[in-house]
C-alpha cells in the first residue's frame, strides 16, 4: 500500500480503511479536500502506560459505527455533504526514531497547509501536537491554544521527547500565546505561573457550559486557534483506555457541548490524542474519541452553512 512517505507500509498498527468510511487518499496535497485526517501511530514520548500508537486504528475502526447516520443529531445535516474530508492514512516513520517522526510529521503538515488544507490528526501520544504546532505557526503565525486535558503538559523536565512538556516548549518557541490560551479539565499539579488560563475540572463541571464557553471566547478572541483534545480530559468512566487516567474528569456529554459552544472560534487545526485501546472496555474510549473527532468536523461544516 502506498503511504505518505511513498514507501510500502508494513506497519503493524496501520490499516486500510478511512475514518467514518471517508475516502482514503495517500497523496492529499493536490486533492480538492478541505480537511485531511492523518493518523500518527507514535507513543515513544509516553510517561505512563504505552499503547497509544494503536489509537488511530482504534478510532477509525469504531468510527464505522458512526458512519450510518446521515443528518447527525443534533446538527440535522450531513457533514459529508458540506465539507470535503479525506483520510490520508498513517504517518510512516522508522519505528523507534522519535526525531524522524517529528520531522516527517512537521513536513507533512507544512505541505498540507501550504496547499490550503486543514488538518484533523489522531494520535498517538500528546507529543505529536508539538510538531503540528510548529507547522501551523509557520503558516498562521502565533496561535491561541484551546486544550482539553487532565494535565497541563507544561512541565520543564529537559526531555526533548515527552508528552508532558509540549506546552512548556511551544510558548518558548513562539508558537502559541499562553495569555490567549485556555486549558480545560485540568485536575493534576501544575505551575500557576506559566501564563495559561486553567479551567480545572471541578469548576468546568460545576459551572454552566454557557459560562465556560463565554470565558473561553473572551480569552481567545479572534486569534487563530489550535484545538487539541487529550482523551484523558474525560473521566475514566467515559474513557478508561488511556495511558494516564485521572478520576474527576468531564463527562462525554459536557465535552460535546463545550465543543459545540466554541464553534465560532477561528479554529485552524485540530487533534485528538492518547487513546490506548489495550486498556479500553468495549471500545468506549475509542468511541468517545471518534465521536469527538466527528463533532470537530461538524463544527467546521456548520460554519459553511447550507
From Swiss-Prot:
Transmembrane segments: none annotated. Belongs to the arginase family. Agmatinase subfamily. Its EC number is 3.5.3.11. HAMAP family: SpeB (MF_01418). InterPro entries: Agmatinase, Agmatinase-rel, Ureohydrolase, Ureohydrolase_dom_sf, Ureohydrolase_Mn_BS. It catalyses: agmatine + H2O = urea + putrescine. Its cofactor is Mn(2+). Gene3D superfamilies: Ureohydrolase domain. The keyword Metal-binding applies. SUPFAM superfamilies: Arginase/deacetylase. It comes from the Bacteria. Keywords: Hydrolase, Manganese, Metal-binding, Polyamine biosynthesis, Putrescine biosynthesis, Spermidine biosynthesis. This is Agmatinase. The keyword Metal-binding applies. Mn(2+) binds at residues 126, 149, 151, 153, 230, 232. Catalyzes the formation of putrescine from agmatine. One of its GO terms (molecular function) is agmatinase activity. One of its GO terms (biological process) is putrescine biosynthetic process from arginine, via agmatine. Pfam families: Arginase (PF00491). PROSITE patterns: ARGINASE_1 (PS01053), ARGINASE_2 (PS51409). Pathway: Amine and polyamine biosynthesis; putrescine biosynthesis via agmatine pathway; putrescine from agmatine: step 1/1. It comes from Cronobacter sakazakii (strain ATCC BAA-894) (Enterobacter sakazakii).
Amino acid at each position: 500500500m502506498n503511504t505518505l512517505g511513498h514507501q510500502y507500509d508494513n506497519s503493524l498498527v496501520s490499516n486500510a480503511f478511512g475514518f467514518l468510511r471517508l475516502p482514503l487518499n495517500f497523496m492529499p496535497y493536490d486533492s480538492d479536500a478541505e480537511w485531511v485526517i492523518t493518523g500518527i501511530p507514535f507513543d515513544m514520548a509516553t510517561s505512563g502506560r504505552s499503547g497509544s500508537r494503536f489509537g488511530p486504528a482504534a478510532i477509525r475502526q469504531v468510527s464505522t459505527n458512526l458512519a450510518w447516520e446521515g443528518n447527525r443529531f443534533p446538527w440535522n445535516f450531513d457533514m459529508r455533504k458540506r465539507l470535503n474530508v479525506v483520510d490520508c492514512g498513517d504517518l510512516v516513520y522508522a519505528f523507534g526514531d522519535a526525531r524522524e517522526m517529528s520531522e516527517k510529521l512537521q513536513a507533512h503538515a507544512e505541505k498540507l497547509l501550504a496547499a490550503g488544507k486543514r488538518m484533523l490528526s489522531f494520535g498517538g501520544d500528546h507529543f505529536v501536537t508539538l510538531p503540528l504546532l510548529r507547522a501551523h505557526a509557520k503558516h498562521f503565525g502565533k496561535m491561541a491554544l484551546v486544550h482539553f486535558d487532565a494535565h497541563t503538559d507544561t512541565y520543564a523536565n529537559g526531555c526533548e521527547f515527552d508528552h508532558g512538556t509540549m506546552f512548556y516548549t511551544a510558548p518558548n518557541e513562539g508558537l502559541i500565546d499562553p495569555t490567549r490560551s485556555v486549558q480545560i479539565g485540568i485536575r493534576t499539579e501544575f505551575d500557576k505561573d506559566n501564563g495559561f488560563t486553567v479551567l480545572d475540572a471541578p469548576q468546568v463541571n460545576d459551572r454552566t457550559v454557557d459560562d465556560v464557553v463565554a470565558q473561553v471566547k473572551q480569552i481567545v478572541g479572534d486569534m487563530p486557534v489550535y484545538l487539541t483534545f487529550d482523551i484523558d480530559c474525560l473521566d475514566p468512566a467515559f474513557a478508561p483506555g488511556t495511558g494516564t487516567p485521572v478520576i474527576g474528569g468531564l463527562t462525554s456529554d459536557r465535552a460535546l457541548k463545550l465543543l459545540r459552544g466554541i464553534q465560532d472560534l477561528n479554529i485552524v487545526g485540530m487533534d485528538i490524542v492518547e487513546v490506548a485501546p489495550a486498556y479500553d472496555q468495549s471500545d468506549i474510549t475509542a468511541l468517545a474519541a471518534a465521536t469527538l473527532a466527528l463533532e470537530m468536523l461538524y463544527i467546521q461544516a456548520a460554519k459553511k452553512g447550507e
